[in-house]
């Protein structure tokens, strides 16, 4: 493998879910307002999130299986298998909706900021639909990934990969979002985020 550049650690995979599967997840999200929660920090982010609950375990299993296939492809493509932790754990799967209201989006940030999030080593964003705007943008690397049904982006969550969720302009953007994290050390009581 030739010398790897930072942008090479941002991988995009197409067709991880069919358009029909994506539409079904969006419909189920919209049919579950009791499980939705507005997440908002002035000047930083705003979106509606649905954290997977016992009513969504089938979705968590489906997404978990799909992601495990692509996480394997990720570390194989980069030749980092020997550095990949055995038996990584997955943070809860979240479905998110960003409205085209001029407020929803996520300013540049990283996904590891403190002891609680320090177990994260991979970010996964699975887009469920197409919209104008709504790109995941890596400003330091000038890399932009547009939303499309079944498109998956995988990258490290660290300070070398600040990224933004740009606001959608014409319709809501829906994503599935999760992280892989290191398993706790043997004998540790910590479970992670």
Predicted region positions:
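Fe(II)/2-oxoglutarate oxygenase catalytic core
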Residues: 1-152, 160-193
């Amino acid at each position: 493998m030739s010398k790897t550049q930072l942008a090479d650690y941002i991988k995009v995979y197409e067709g991880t879910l069919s358009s029909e599967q994506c539409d079904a997840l969006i419909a189920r999200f919209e049919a579950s307002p009791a499980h939705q929660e507005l997440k908002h920090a002035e000047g930083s982010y705003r979106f509606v999130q649905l954290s997977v609950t016992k009513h969504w375990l089938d979705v968590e299993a489906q997404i978990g299986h799909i992601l495990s296939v692509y996480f394997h492809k990720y570390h194989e493509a980069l030749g980092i298998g020997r550095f990949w932790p055995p038996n990584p754990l997955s943070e809860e799967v979240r479905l998110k909706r960003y409205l085209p209201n001029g407020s929803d989006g996520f300013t540049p940030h990283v996904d590891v900021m403190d002891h609680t999030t320090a177990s994260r080593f991979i970010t996964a964003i699975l887009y469920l639909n197409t919209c104008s705007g709504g790109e995941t943008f890596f400003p330091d690397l000038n890399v932009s990934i547009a939303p499309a049904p079944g498109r998956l982006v995988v990258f490290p969550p660290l300070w070398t990969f600040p990224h933004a969720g740009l606001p959608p302009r014409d319709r809501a953007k829906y994503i599935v979002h999760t992280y892989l994290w290191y398993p706790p050390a043997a004998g540790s009581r910590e479970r992670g985020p």
